[in-house]
């Protein structure tokens, strides 16, 4: 048994791509399985990663032995919840910030939650972001969206965040259908 931690495309040190659709990200996961010669795996995905592993159920269900989706539902959220975050990230990109401390100072002009700032700063290294900001902004409708896929007929664990708006009773039918 082993664990493979995947940075999704346009995040961390993963390859950059102009496309951020869930079918494309599911293919990335399948390519990762193939690259590591893994026939079947249990997938645990958080947020966008959770949607990517759900999309994998439509692409290669035979390769999935278990699925856990954390703080995400298989729905189109129709809401831009992250505009303030993008504003903070862009402000840092346009500033002369070269350290996390300087970047945090710029971000506090746009964001109130220190936990969110510190989480984002994990991806600020050597004066630059480790995610592809222009593509994430451009592809945002695909990231918050969701195309209905066939139900995966195996148990799936959905874990909501404590005060999260992403897994609520309003999405119960979508969770049961997935």
Language model region names:
Residues 126-178:
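Conserved serine/cysteine hydrolase catalytic core
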Residues 87-94, 102-115, 123, 139, ...:
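Helix-loop "lid/cap" segments that line or gate small-molecule binding pockets
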Residues 2, 37-42, 63-66, 157:
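Structural signature of beta-strand start/N-cap positions in the alpha/beta core
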Residues 54-59, 63-100:
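Flexible "cap/lid" loop of the alpha/beta hydrolase fold
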Residues 4-44, 48, 52:
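Active-site loop/oxyanion-hole signature of alpha/beta-hydrolase fold enzymes
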Residues 14-20, 78-81, 169:
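Conserved catalytic-core motifs of eukaryotic protein kinase domains, centered on the activation segment
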């Amino acid at each position: 048994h082993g664990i493979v931690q995947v940075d999704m495309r346009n995040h961390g040190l993963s390859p950059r791509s102009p496309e951020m659709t869930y079918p494309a990200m599911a293919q990335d996961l399948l390519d990762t399985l193939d690259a590591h010669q893994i026939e079947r795996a249990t997938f645990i995905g958080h947020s966008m990663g959770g949607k990517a592993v759900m999309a994998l159920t439509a692409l290669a269900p035979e390769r999935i032995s278990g699925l856990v989706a954390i703080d995400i539902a298989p729905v189109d959220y129709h809401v831009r919840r992250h505009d303030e975050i993008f504003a903070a990230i862009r402000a840092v990109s346009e500033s002369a910030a070269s350290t996390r401390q300087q970047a945090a100072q710029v971000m506090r002009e746009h964001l109130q939650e220190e936990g969110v700032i510190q989480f984002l700063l994990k991806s600020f290294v050597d004066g630059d972001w480790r995610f592809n900001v222009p593509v994430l902004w451009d592809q945002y409708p695909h990231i918050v969206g969701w195309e209905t896929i066939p139900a995966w007929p195996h148990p799936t664990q959905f874990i909501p965040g404590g005060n999260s708006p992403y897994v609520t009773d309003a999405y119960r039918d979508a969770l049961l259908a997935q």
